From Swiss-Prot:
Residue positions with a glycan: N166
Record membrane topology: Multi-pass membrane protein
Membrane-spanning parts: 33-53, 76-96, 101-121, 135-155, 171-191, 202-222, 240-260, 271-291, 300-320
UniProt KW Transmembrane keyword: yes
Provenance organism: Pongo abelii
Record's protein name: NIPA-like protein 3
Modified residues (Phosphoserine): S372
A single GO molecular function term of this UniProt record: magnesium ion transmembrane transporter activity
InterPro entries registered for this protein in UniProt: Mg_trans_NIPA
Cell compartments where the protein resides: Membrane
Gene assigned in the entry: NIPAL3
Length: 406
Protein backbone atom coordinates (compact mmCIF):
# COMPACT_ATOMS: atom_id res chain seq x y z
CA UNK A 1 0.00 0.00 0.00
CA UNK A 2 2.77 2.40 0.92
CA UNK A 3 4.58 1.72 -2.37
CA UNK A 4 1.47 2.28 -4.47
CA UNK A 5 0.62 5.43 -2.49
CA UNK A 6 4.12 6.91 -3.03
CA UNK A 7 3.96 6.07 -6.76
CA UNK A 8 0.63 7.87 -7.02
CA UNK A 9 2.15 10.89 -5.30
CA UNK A 10 5.03 10.89 -7.77
CA UNK A 11 2.62 10.72 -10.71
CA UNK A 12 0.64 13.61 -9.30
CA UNK A 13 3.77 15.73 -8.91
CA UNK A 14 5.02 15.23 -12.51
CA UNK A 15 2.70 17.71 -14.29
CA UNK A 16 3.56 20.65 -12.00
CA UNK A 17 7.25 19.93 -12.54
CA UNK A 18 6.97 20.08 -16.35
CA UNK A 19 4.85 23.26 -16.29
CA UNK A 20 7.26 24.98 -13.93
CA UNK A 21 10.10 24.02 -16.28
CA UNK A 22 8.26 25.63 -19.21
CA UNK A 23 7.59 28.74 -17.15
CA UNK A 24 11.24 29.00 -16.11
CA UNK A 25 12.33 28.59 -19.75
CA UNK A 26 9.95 31.36 -20.85
CA UNK A 27 11.17 33.58 -18.00
CA UNK A 28 14.79 32.99 -18.99
CA UNK A 29 13.96 33.78 -22.63
CA UNK A 30 12.26 37.03 -21.59
CA UNK A 31 15.32 37.97 -19.52
CA UNK A 32 17.57 37.41 -22.52
CA UNK A 33 15.27 39.59 -24.62
CA UNK A 34 15.43 42.31 -21.99
CA UNK A 35 19.23 42.13 -21.82
CA UNK A 36 19.49 42.36 -25.60
CA UNK A 37 17.02 45.25 -25.78
CA UNK A 38 18.84 47.20 -23.06
CA UNK A 39 22.18 46.64 -24.77
CA UNK A 40 20.76 47.84 -28.10
CA UNK A 41 19.14 50.93 -26.54
CA UNK A 42 22.35 51.75 -24.67
CA UNK A 43 24.45 51.24 -27.80
CA UNK A 44 22.30 53.43 -30.05
CA UNK A 45 22.11 56.13 -27.39
CA UNK A 46 25.89 56.19 -26.90
CA UNK A 47 26.52 56.21 -30.67
CA UNK A 48 24.20 59.20 -31.07
CA UNK A 49 26.01 61.07 -28.29
CA UNK A 50 29.38 60.19 -29.86
CA UNK A 51 28.39 61.49 -33.29
CA UNK A 52 27.11 64.74 -31.82
CA UNK A 53 30.32 65.14 -29.79
CA UNK A 54 32.45 64.75 -32.90
CA UNK A 55 30.22 67.16 -34.81
CA UNK A 56 30.52 69.65 -31.95
CA UNK A 57 34.31 69.29 -32.08
CA UNK A 58 34.40 70.08 -35.82
CA UNK A 59 32.09 73.09 -35.41
CA UNK A 60 34.09 74.47 -32.48
CA UNK A 61 37.37 74.22 -34.39
CA UNK A 62 35.82 75.83 -37.46
CA UNK A 63 34.54 78.76 -35.39
CA UNK A 64 37.76 79.46 -33.49
CA UNK A 65 41.38 80.36 -34.23
CA UNK A 66 42.66 77.02 -32.93
CA UNK A 67 45.11 75.63 -35.52
CA UNK A 68 44.92 72.06 -34.20
CA UNK A 69 43.52 69.25 -36.32
CA UNK A 70 40.33 67.61 -35.07
CA UNK A 71 42.09 64.33 -34.23
CA UNK A 72 44.35 66.18 -31.80
CA UNK A 73 41.47 67.23 -29.55
CA UNK A 74 40.23 65.31 -26.52
CA UNK A 75 36.60 65.84 -27.51
CA UNK A 76 37.00 64.02 -30.81
CA UNK A 77 38.78 61.08 -29.19
CA UNK A 78 36.08 60.90 -26.52
CA UNK A 79 33.50 60.75 -29.30
CA UNK A 80 35.44 57.97 -31.05
CA UNK A 81 35.67 55.96 -27.82
CA UNK A 82 31.96 56.34 -27.14
CA UNK A 83 31.16 55.34 -30.72
CA UNK A 84 33.19 52.13 -30.43
CA UNK A 85 31.55 51.40 -27.07
CA UNK A 86 28.09 51.93 -28.52
CA UNK A 87 28.75 49.77 -31.57
CA UNK A 88 30.06 47.04 -29.28
CA UNK A 89 26.84 47.21 -27.26
CA UNK A 90 24.68 46.94 -30.38
CA UNK A 91 26.80 44.05 -31.66
CA UNK A 92 26.48 42.17 -28.37
CA UNK A 93 22.72 42.71 -28.26
CA UNK A 94 22.25 40.44 -31.29
CA UNK A 95 23.63 37.51 -29.28
CA UNK A 96 20.83 37.72 -26.68
CA UNK A 97 17.65 38.94 -28.35
CA UNK A 98 15.94 38.04 -31.64
CA UNK A 99 16.91 39.96 -34.73
CA UNK A 100 13.30 41.14 -35.11
CA UNK A 101 13.57 42.98 -31.78
CA UNK A 102 17.03 44.53 -32.15
CA UNK A 103 16.67 45.98 -35.66
CA UNK A 104 13.71 48.36 -34.98
CA UNK A 105 15.43 49.71 -31.86
CA UNK A 106 17.68 51.83 -34.08
CA UNK A 107 14.89 54.40 -33.72
CA UNK A 108 16.50 55.22 -30.36
CA UNK A 109 19.40 56.92 -32.14
CA UNK A 110 16.95 59.13 -34.08
CA UNK A 111 15.16 60.09 -30.85
CA UNK A 112 18.44 60.86 -29.10
CA UNK A 113 19.73 62.93 -32.01
CA UNK A 114 16.54 65.00 -32.06
CA UNK A 115 16.71 65.70 -28.31
CA UNK A 116 20.44 66.47 -28.34
CA UNK A 117 19.98 68.76 -31.33
CA UNK A 118 17.34 70.78 -29.47
CA UNK A 119 19.46 70.99 -26.30
CA UNK A 120 22.52 72.30 -28.15
CA UNK A 121 20.63 75.05 -29.99
CA UNK A 122 22.33 78.38 -29.39
CA UNK A 123 19.47 80.62 -30.48
CA UNK A 124 16.86 81.86 -28.03
CA UNK A 125 13.27 81.06 -28.86
CA UNK A 126 10.04 82.26 -27.38
CA UNK A 127 7.97 79.36 -26.03
CA UNK A 128 5.32 79.83 -28.71
CA UNK A 129 7.86 79.90 -31.54
CA UNK A 130 9.77 77.00 -30.00
CA UNK A 131 6.68 74.78 -29.89
CA UNK A 132 5.67 75.78 -33.39
CA UNK A 133 9.11 74.89 -34.71
CA UNK A 134 9.62 71.60 -32.83
CA UNK A 135 6.10 70.29 -32.32
CA UNK A 136 6.63 67.55 -34.92
CA UNK A 137 9.84 66.46 -33.20
CA UNK A 138 8.10 66.16 -29.83
CA UNK A 139 5.18 64.21 -31.30
CA UNK A 140 7.59 62.00 -33.25
CA UNK A 141 9.68 61.28 -30.15
CA UNK A 142 6.55 60.34 -28.22
CA UNK A 143 5.36 57.98 -30.95
CA UNK A 144 8.82 56.43 -31.30
CA UNK A 145 8.97 55.79 -27.54
CA UNK A 146 5.51 54.17 -27.59
CA UNK A 147 6.52 52.04 -30.57
CA UNK A 148 9.74 50.99 -28.83
CA UNK A 149 7.79 49.95 -25.72
CA UNK A 150 5.44 47.80 -27.80
CA UNK A 151 8.39 46.24 -29.62
CA UNK A 152 10.11 45.24 -26.39
CA UNK A 153 6.89 44.00 -24.77
CA UNK A 154 5.55 41.89 -27.64
CA UNK A 155 8.81 40.80 -29.29
CA UNK A 156 9.26 37.09 -30.05
CA UNK A 157 11.22 35.15 -27.46
CA UNK A 158 14.62 33.74 -28.39
CA UNK A 159 14.78 30.00 -27.73
CA UNK A 160 17.79 28.86 -29.71
CA UNK A 161 21.53 29.07 -29.09
CA UNK A 162 23.68 30.18 -32.01
CA UNK A 163 25.80 27.06 -32.30
CA UNK A 164 27.58 26.14 -35.50
CA UNK A 165 25.15 23.28 -36.17
CA UNK A 166 22.09 25.51 -35.78
CA UNK A 167 23.48 28.26 -38.02
CA UNK A 168 24.39 25.73 -40.72
CA UNK A 169 20.96 24.12 -40.51
CA UNK A 170 19.24 27.49 -40.96
CA UNK A 171 21.55 28.46 -43.81
CA UNK A 172 20.68 25.41 -45.94
CA UNK A 173 16.96 25.38 -45.13
CA UNK A 174 14.74 25.70 -48.20
CA UNK A 175 12.79 28.80 -46.98
CA UNK A 176 16.01 30.78 -46.62
CA UNK A 177 17.43 29.47 -49.91
CA UNK A 178 14.22 30.59 -51.65
CA UNK A 179 14.45 33.97 -49.92
CA UNK A 180 18.08 34.33 -50.99
CA UNK A 181 17.16 33.55 -54.60
CA UNK A 182 14.45 36.23 -54.62
CA UNK A 183 16.75 38.75 -52.92
CA UNK A 184 19.61 38.16 -55.37
CA UNK A 185 17.30 38.57 -58.38
CA UNK A 186 15.79 41.76 -56.95
CA UNK A 187 19.22 43.14 -56.06
CA UNK A 188 20.57 42.49 -59.57
CA UNK A 189 17.54 44.15 -61.18
CA UNK A 190 17.83 47.23 -58.96
CA UNK A 191 21.58 47.43 -59.54
CA UNK A 192 21.04 47.23 -63.31
CA UNK A 193 18.50 50.06 -63.31
CA UNK A 194 20.69 52.13 -60.98
CA UNK A 195 23.93 51.73 -62.95
CA UNK A 196 22.76 51.33 -66.54
CA UNK A 197 19.49 53.26 -66.63
CA UNK A 198 20.56 56.00 -64.17
CA UNK A 199 17.60 55.27 -61.91
CA UNK A 200 18.76 57.54 -59.08
CA UNK A 201 15.48 57.46 -57.19
CA UNK A 202 16.02 57.37 -53.44
CA UNK A 203 13.82 54.27 -53.07
CA UNK A 204 16.02 52.36 -55.55
CA UNK A 205 19.25 53.27 -53.74
CA UNK A 206 17.88 52.62 -50.26
CA UNK A 207 16.37 49.31 -51.37
CA UNK A 208 19.88 48.26 -52.37
CA UNK A 209 21.07 49.35 -48.93
CA UNK A 210 18.22 47.50 -47.21
CA UNK A 211 18.82 44.25 -49.10
CA UNK A 212 22.49 44.33 -48.17
CA UNK A 213 21.61 45.37 -44.62
CA UNK A 214 19.31 42.38 -44.15
CA UNK A 215 22.22 40.06 -44.85
CA UNK A 216 24.45 42.13 -42.59
CA UNK A 217 22.18 41.76 -39.56
CA UNK A 218 21.61 38.05 -40.24
CA UNK A 219 25.36 37.41 -40.25
CA UNK A 220 25.95 39.76 -37.30
CA UNK A 221 23.57 37.76 -35.13
CA UNK A 222 25.28 34.50 -36.08
CA UNK A 223 28.79 35.86 -35.45
CA UNK A 224 27.82 37.57 -32.18
CA UNK A 225 25.98 34.51 -30.88
CA UNK A 226 28.86 32.17 -31.66
CA UNK A 227 31.36 34.55 -30.05
CA UNK A 228 29.30 34.80 -26.85
CA UNK A 229 28.98 31.02 -26.65
CA UNK A 230 32.75 30.70 -27.14
CA UNK A 231 33.38 33.18 -24.32
CA UNK A 232 31.01 31.19 -22.09
CA UNK A 233 33.09 28.05 -22.69
CA UNK A 234 31.26 26.40 -25.59
CA UNK A 235 33.85 26.97 -28.33
CA UNK A 236 32.32 27.69 -31.75
CA UNK A 237 35.29 29.22 -33.56
CA UNK A 238 36.36 25.87 -35.02
CA UNK A 239 33.27 25.76 -37.25
CA UNK A 240 33.88 26.98 -40.84
CA UNK A 241 30.43 28.59 -40.86
CA UNK A 242 31.70 31.19 -38.38
CA UNK A 243 34.28 32.51 -40.85
CA UNK A 244 31.82 32.36 -43.76
CA UNK A 245 29.40 34.51 -41.78
CA UNK A 246 32.18 36.88 -40.73
CA UNK A 247 33.32 37.48 -44.32
CA UNK A 248 29.73 38.04 -45.47
CA UNK A 249 29.18 40.46 -42.59
CA UNK A 250 32.19 42.60 -43.49
CA UNK A 251 31.53 42.55 -47.25
CA UNK A 252 27.85 43.51 -47.02
CA UNK A 253 28.61 46.23 -44.47
CA UNK A 254 31.24 47.80 -46.74
CA UNK A 255 29.00 47.84 -49.83
CA UNK A 256 26.09 49.06 -47.75
CA UNK A 257 28.18 52.03 -46.59
CA UNK A 258 29.19 52.75 -50.20
CA UNK A 259 25.57 52.96 -51.39
CA UNK A 260 24.66 55.11 -48.38
CA UNK A 261 27.47 57.49 -49.25
CA UNK A 262 26.16 57.80 -52.80
CA UNK A 263 22.65 58.46 -51.53
CA UNK A 264 23.88 61.18 -49.16
CA UNK A 265 25.43 63.03 -52.10
CA UNK A 266 22.08 63.27 -53.90
CA UNK A 267 19.44 63.50 -51.15
CA UNK A 268 18.89 65.19 -47.82
CA UNK A 269 20.04 63.26 -44.75
CA UNK A 270 16.63 63.51 -43.05
CA UNK A 271 14.93 61.88 -46.03
CA UNK A 272 17.57 59.14 -46.09
CA UNK A 273 17.10 58.53 -42.35
CA UNK A 274 13.31 58.12 -42.52
CA UNK A 275 13.02 56.14 -45.77
CA UNK A 276 16.10 54.06 -44.99
CA UNK A 277 14.86 53.18 -41.50
CA UNK A 278 11.49 52.00 -42.81
CA UNK A 279 12.88 49.94 -45.69
CA UNK A 280 15.83 48.47 -43.78
CA UNK A 281 13.74 47.52 -40.75
CA UNK A 282 11.01 45.88 -42.83
CA UNK A 283 13.39 43.79 -44.94
CA UNK A 284 15.62 42.89 -41.97
CA UNK A 285 12.65 41.66 -39.91
CA UNK A 286 11.52 39.57 -42.89
CA UNK A 287 14.99 38.06 -43.25
CA UNK A 288 15.18 37.31 -39.53
CA UNK A 289 11.75 35.70 -39.52
CA UNK A 290 12.78 33.41 -42.40
CA UNK A 291 16.34 32.58 -41.32
CA UNK A 292 15.95 32.32 -37.53
CA UNK A 293 12.20 31.49 -37.48
CA UNK A 294 11.60 34.28 -34.97
CA UNK A 295 7.80 34.15 -35.03
CA UNK A 296 7.35 30.37 -34.97
CA UNK A 297 5.07 29.47 -32.05
CA UNK A 298 3.98 33.05 -31.36
CA UNK A 299 0.26 33.78 -31.07
CA UNK A 300 -1.53 36.12 -33.44
CA UNK A 301 -2.07 38.83 -30.79
CA UNK A 302 1.65 39.17 -30.07
CA UNK A 303 2.49 39.32 -33.77
CA UNK A 304 -0.16 41.99 -34.41
CA UNK A 305 0.98 44.11 -31.45
CA UNK A 306 4.59 43.79 -32.58
CA UNK A 307 3.61 44.94 -36.09
CA UNK A 308 1.67 47.85 -34.55
CA UNK A 309 4.78 48.84 -32.58
CA UNK A 310 6.80 48.85 -35.80
CA UNK A 311 4.25 51.06 -37.56
CA UNK A 312 4.15 53.53 -34.67
CA UNK A 313 7.97 53.66 -34.58
CA UNK A 314 8.01 54.24 -38.35
CA UNK A 315 5.59 57.16 -38.00
CA UNK A 316 7.62 58.63 -35.13
CA UNK A 317 10.88 58.52 -37.06
CA UNK A 318 9.17 60.04 -40.10
CA UNK A 319 7.84 62.98 -38.05
CA UNK A 320 11.21 63.58 -36.36
CA UNK A 321 13.11 63.68 -39.63
CA UNK A 322 10.32 65.64 -41.34
CA UNK A 323 10.94 68.55 -38.96
CA UNK A 324 14.62 68.89 -39.91
CA UNK A 325 15.58 71.56 -42.38
CA UNK A 326 18.32 71.42 -44.96
CA UNK A 327 21.53 73.10 -43.94
CA UNK A 328 22.65 75.95 -46.17
CA UNK A 329 26.27 75.35 -47.11
CA UNK A 330 28.71 78.22 -46.55
CA UNK A 331 31.49 78.71 -49.05
CA UNK A 332 34.39 80.63 -47.51
CA UNK A 333 36.27 81.23 -50.77
CA UNK A 334 34.67 83.86 -52.99
CA UNK A 335 35.40 84.29 -56.67
CA UNK A 336 35.98 88.03 -56.93
CA UNK A 337 35.71 88.13 -60.71
CA UNK A 338 32.12 86.92 -60.47
CA UNK A 339 31.06 89.94 -58.40
CA UNK A 340 29.20 92.69 -60.30
CA UNK A 341 30.64 96.19 -60.03
CA UNK A 342 34.17 94.95 -59.52
CA UNK A 343 35.64 97.44 -61.98
CA UNK A 344 34.00 100.38 -60.20
CA UNK A 345 35.59 99.25 -56.94
CA UNK A 346 39.00 99.31 -58.64
CA UNK A 347 38.40 102.80 -60.05
CA UNK A 348 37.31 104.28 -56.73
CA UNK A 349 40.00 102.59 -54.69
CA UNK A 350 37.43 100.79 -52.55
CA UNK A 351 38.11 97.72 -50.45
CA UNK A 352 38.43 94.65 -52.63
CA UNK A 353 37.94 92.11 -49.85
CA UNK A 354 35.92 93.11 -46.81
CA UNK A 355 37.14 92.22 -43.37
CA UNK A 356 35.67 88.96 -42.09
CA UNK A 357 35.85 88.19 -38.40
CA UNK A 358 35.81 84.44 -38.75
CA UNK A 359 38.19 81.54 -38.70
CA UNK A 360 38.28 81.06 -42.47
CA UNK A 361 41.58 82.22 -43.95
CA UNK A 362 41.13 83.58 -47.45
CA UNK A 363 43.69 82.79 -50.09
CA UNK A 364 44.96 84.93 -52.94
CA UNK A 365 42.47 86.64 -55.19
CA UNK A 366 41.59 84.73 -58.32
CA UNK A 367 42.98 86.09 -61.58
CA UNK A 368 40.68 87.11 -64.39
CA UNK A 369 42.06 87.34 -67.89
CA UNK A 370 39.43 89.83 -69.04
CA UNK A 371 40.18 92.29 -66.26
CA UNK A 372 43.95 91.91 -66.66
CA UNK A 373 43.68 93.13 -70.26
CA UNK A 374 42.24 96.45 -69.05
CA UNK A 375 44.04 96.95 -65.78
CA UNK A 376 47.68 96.66 -64.93
CA UNK A 377 48.57 94.49 -61.94
CA UNK A 378 47.61 96.22 -58.71
CA UNK A 379 50.28 97.04 -56.16
CA UNK A 380 49.38 95.36 -52.89
CA UNK A 381 50.98 95.80 -49.46
CA UNK A 382 53.85 93.46 -48.76
CA UNK A 383 52.09 90.81 -46.72
CA UNK A 384 52.34 87.06 -46.60
CA UNK A 385 49.47 84.76 -45.93
CA UNK A 386 49.44 80.99 -45.84
CA UNK A 387 46.43 78.78 -46.19
CA UNK A 388 45.42 77.32 -42.87
CA UNK A 389 47.34 79.99 -40.94
CA UNK A 390 46.42 80.68 -37.40
CA UNK A 391 44.34 83.75 -38.20
CA UNK A 392 43.33 85.67 -41.24
CA UNK A 393 44.68 89.14 -41.82
CA UNK A 394 42.44 91.78 -40.33
CA UNK A 395 43.66 94.46 -42.80
CA UNK A 396 41.64 94.44 -46.01
CA UNK A 397 43.38 94.43 -49.34
CA UNK A 398 43.19 97.80 -51.11
CA UNK A 399 44.13 98.71 -54.66
CA UNK A 400 46.95 101.26 -54.39
CA UNK A 401 47.63 101.97 -58.03
CA UNK A 402 46.34 101.07 -61.44
CA UNK A 403 46.87 102.29 -64.96
CA UNK A 404 44.73 101.66 -67.98
CA UNK A 405 46.34 100.27 -71.08
CA UNK A 406 45.82 102.24 -74.25
Amino acid sequence: MDGSHSAALQLQQLPPTSSSSAMSEASFSYKENLIGALLAIFGHLVVSIALNLQKYCHIRLAGSKDPRAYFKTKTWWLGLFLMLLGELGVFASYAFAPLSLIVPLSAVSVIASAIIGIIFIKEKWKPKDFLRRYILSFVGCGLAVVGTYLLVTFAPNSREKMTGENVTRHLVSWPFLLYMLVEIILFCLLLYFYKEKNANNIVVILLLVALLGSMTVVTVKAVAGMLVLSIQGNLQLDYPIFYVMFVCMVATAVYQAAFLSQASQMYDSSLIASVGYILSTTIAITAGAIFYLDFIGEDVLHICMFALGCLIAFLGVFLITRNRKKAIPFEPYISMDAMPGMQNMHDKGMTVQPELKASFSYGALENNDNISEIYAPATLPVMQEEHGSRSASGVPYRVLEHTKKE
